[in-house]
Amino acid sequence: MSSSTHTNFKQYLAAVKPQGEAAPAGLQELLIAVTQTCSTLSHEVAQGALIGLLGSAGTGNVQGEVQQKLDIIANDLLIEGVQGCKSLAGLASEEMELPVPVQGTGDYLLLFDPLDGSSNIDVNVSIGTIFSILKKQDPQAPLQTADFLLSGRHQVAAGYVVYGPQTTMALTLGDGVVMFTLNKVTGEFLLIKDAVTIAHSTKEFAINMSNMRHWADPVKRYVEECLAGVGGAREKDFNMRWIASMVADVHRVLSRGGVFMYPWDQREPHKPGKLRLMYEANPMSFLVEQAGGASTNGTQLIMDLQPTDLHERVSVMLGSKEEIDRLQHYHSSLA
């Protein structure tokens, strides 16, 4: 099938009517700027060692993590790419301590993880960009960090772009999930799948099994039952997957079902989890819920959590609804 038979991203935004209304022009402008930047970033990622982009940058981010060269490049590209958006009041990045004013006033706030899974860059495993867009509560007021501290229910759009064998984007505007693939000749994202859904049941889970001894009892119980297979309490065999790149693992869940888990563990008991609520958990939870799945920290739905810090961390379990319901039940019954 030729690319001319596919709807491109701009055409999709012009035609789509989430909640029965056309996407606001300012939101369209911002989403187009983000995707155009991701198209550029896809090219940079693909060049890798050929243009000297692999390896550590020798610096650390606000999270205390070693930055890869591409982390910094991706962050800079995204900031530069959205600077001209008149409706964008400000942005926040996983790589930076404080928000950055863009227009100062405006309707929207952008949050992003510029390059999720960047520890996999040098081994050529899929990585990606995750983004979330919020409506600024008072568009005319000067930008403050507190403007970003809204629950996931306030998101008006969220998505990710995964840089793999194809560069593919998943997007929700709050009315289901659609997917696009980048035509690397034209630089356009083309619609490949609408009405993406996650099956309610599954036989596949993703978790880092090497940390099993550190997990809380409800997660241990769930995984042990999966491992017991057809002869155990679940009476069916499960497969385990783990890419160690959230964007790639969640893309698999959206594409064919399953459960992704990055739970709290006892190695850092004072931290509620590893993943970032605002840059990773909220946008991925929005996508998963819109595809018919669910997302929890064990006791609460991720999207209902009220953030108190821009870089807040959280335990994450998301995917097929029956499995997430089971995990929540185990957490409540073993509490």
Swiss-Prot record:
Highest taxon above the source species: Bacteria
Binding positions for substrate per the UniProt entry: D116, G117, S118, S119, N208, K274
Cofactor(s) this protein cannot do without: Mg(2+)
Disulfide bonds: none
Pfam families the record matches: FBPase, FBPase_C
Catalytic activity entry: beta-D-fructose 1,6-bisphosphate + H2O = beta-D-fructose 6-phosphate + phosphate
Entry EC number(s): 3.1.3.11
Cellular compartment(s): Cytoplasm
Record carries keyword ATP-binding: no
Listed pathway(s): Carbohydrate biosynthesis; gluconeogenesis
Keywords: Carbohydrate metabolism, Cytoplasm, Hydrolase, Magnesium, Metal-binding
UniProt family annotation: Belongs to the FBPase class 1 family.
Subunit structure: Homotetramer.
Protein name in the entry: Fructose-1,6-bisphosphatase class 1
Organism the protein comes from: Polynucleobacter asymbioticus (strain DSM 18221 / CIP 109841 / QLW-P1DMWA-1)
Gene name as annotated: fbp
